Each structure stands twice: as structure tokens, then as C-alpha cells.
């Protein structure tokens, strides 16, 4: 009798392992830092993570699948922008780690087109979110913390490069 592998289970285990490796590579040894992407989040969330050191719940596999789709879309967009920059002689920052030690914030900005002084953050969304943003009766108001996150990265950029940003954009893409 031929045994049948459980493809979904194998994929879910792979996603969990990949997420764990990603977390370790980015955040291990940096636990004392607040995250740029957590700007504007509930103070209780910050307290439990940074003061009480409560370990968060495991991420649901459905969320891991959405994260993976977002990673793939981010990767494609970033690769296309790097190609654009290469062909046009443009300077670009992609997935750049930033640190603001005076406020203990660390994060990773998505894209800066340096010559244009333009900062972009790419947000993928699921079908439900997309329908709310772009459907028949759209509500284009993004969560406030998206803007605060982008403002944090903008603060770093202006401090680091001494240039005022001319454009700060959140680009929402259906994943």
C-alpha cells in the first residue's frame, strides 16, 4: 500500500520553521528595542512584550500563509524596484534596518528612492481588507499606526541623510 503524504501539514510545518528562522534572524538579541511597525499600538501590548516579557501566542497557520504571500509580493516589488534603479542609475534603499537609539526604536523600512527623497511602505492585504479599501463603497482610511510607522522611518531618514522627504507613501496591494 502506498502511503499518502499530508502536503498541507508539511507546508504548515515549513511555514512555522521559516517564521521562526525569520524571527531569530531579525529579533534575537534585539529584544530591548521597540519595533517601528508597533508605532501607535496599544501601550498594554508594549508593556507585556517589553516589561513583563510575556511570550506571545504562536502565530496561527492561516496568518503564516498570509504573511508568506505578503513576503512574496514584497520580494517581487522590491526586486522590480532594484532593477528599475539599476537601469536608471537611481540610488535605492530596500528593506533597510533603521535604529533610533534616543527612543529605543528599531525597524526595517521597505523602500526609499534616495534621489527623489521618497519613502514607500508596502502593505499587502487579504481580500476582506482589499474590499474595504477598494470595493464598491471604499473606506480609504488606513489604520493610524501605518502612518505612525512610516513617520518613524521618515524621522530616521531625515536624521540619517539630512534631507527632508518630499514624499511618504503607503502602497496597499492585494496579496
Question: What kind of region is each of these model predictions?
Answer:
Residues 1-119, 126-137, 143-144:
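Metal-dependent nuclease catalytic cores that hydrolyze phosphodiester bonds in DNA/RNA
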Residues 123-124, 169-175:
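Short, structured patches in soluble enzyme cores that scaffold and shape functional sites
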Residues 75-83, 138-172:
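Metal-dependent nuclease catalytic cores in nucleic-acid-processing enzymes
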Amino acid at each position: 500500500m502506498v502511503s499518502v503524504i499530508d502536503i498541507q501539514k508539511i507546508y504548515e510545518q515549513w511555514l512555522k520553521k521559516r517564521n521562526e528562522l525569520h524571527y531569530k534572524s531579525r529579533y534575537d538579541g534585539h529584544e530591548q528595542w521597540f519595533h517601528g511597525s508597533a508605532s501607535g499600538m496599544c501601550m498594554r501590548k508594549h508593556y507585556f512584550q517589553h516589561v513583563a516579557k510575556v511570550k506571545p501566542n504562536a502565530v496561527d497557520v492561516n496568518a503564516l500563509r498570509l504573511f508568506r504571500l505578503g513576503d512574496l509580493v514584497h520580494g517581487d516589488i522590491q526586486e522590480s524596484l532594484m532593477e528599475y534603479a539599476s537601469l536608471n542609475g537611481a540610488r535605492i534603499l530596500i528593506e533597510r534596518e533603521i535604529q533610533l537609539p534616543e527612543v529605543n526604536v528599531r525597524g526595517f523600512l521597505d523602500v526609499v528612492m534616495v534621489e527623489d527623497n521618497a519613502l514607500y511602505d508596502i502593505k499587502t492585504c487579504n481580500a476582506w481588507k482589499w474590499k474595504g479599501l477598494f470595493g464598491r463603497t471604499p473606506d480609504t482610511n488606513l489604520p493610524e499606526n501605518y502612518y505612525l510607522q512610516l513617520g518613524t522611518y521618515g524621522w530616521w531618514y531625515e536624521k540619517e541623510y539630512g534631507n527632508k522627504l518630499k514624499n511618504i507613501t503607503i502602497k496597499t496591494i492585494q496579496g
